[in-house]
Amino acid sequence: MDTILVFSLIITSYNVTKKELRDSSCQVEPLPDLFPKDVRSIRAELIREAQAEAKRPMFIQNQTVAILQCLGSGSKVKVNLVHSEKRQKVKHILKNLRVMTVPCRNSTAPPSCHLTPASKVQAGFLVTGKAFLPGVSQCKVYPVMGASSETYPSTTTSVTPGKKGEKTTKVDGFSSPLNQDTDENLEKRKKWSIVVKVLIAVTLFVSGIAITVFVIFEVPCPSRCQQVRELCQCQRLRRRPRKEDQQPGTAESQSDTQPKKVGQEAPNSSSPKKAVEITVVHQTYF
């Protein structure tokens, strides 16, 4: 029994969620129609936009750039954002997430941000948030990693100037081919595997302790076990007298059968006496 439990624990220890989604990430970059083709560096253009916006009297510091919706299998969701240089009194805000800026190695490459959740995000959960970044007017979200068969969510947002210096956002439809059913199935498998592992471990632990204590060290059973033993002994003692009572009964039955035979033989023994008496009577008449 213990060997079966050990092997079952080894089998269940195998990761049942092997088909879990790979670490996915999303990247936000400006659309190609936003900047002219002759611009060599997008960063320079963003700096120009930032300087132009700084000169305006009505400048909105917190600007909604995109609604980020990414599927991540790990506790960290990586999102690369193209944004302008940081300014004073302007915060990069992402609801329920925190932004960690990473310096760029190449001067021509745009700066990026790693969006890590403030609280740990479990595998398969949909991470949503709004990024408020200055200097970016149009963005799109597309996957950086992933195979050709796997498709990831993509959304485009455009910011257009409105009345009184206000800016509005337009968010396209969010397509998520990765169904949430797969995520729920993975979570259920994880939960059941944990439950099975715990049950097997508990049974192994209890059985191992019982074997080592009562079999190897020969520790006497507690009071309950002694009571059970006494009951078993009483039942055995009750059964023995019954067997002894049955044996004398058979002997008496045999003795009862023997007198019947004697009684049957008695009439035969009395018959000669009668014959003798008859003969004596016949002799007196002569």
Curated annotation (Swiss-Prot):
Disulfide bonds: none annotated. GO terms for cellular component: membrane. The chain crosses the membrane at residues 198-218. Its main location: membrane. InterPro entries: DUF4711 (IPR031668). It is a single-pass membrane protein. This is Uncharacterized protein C17orf78 homolog. The lineage of its organism: Eukaryota, Metazoa, Chordata, Craniata, Vertebrata.
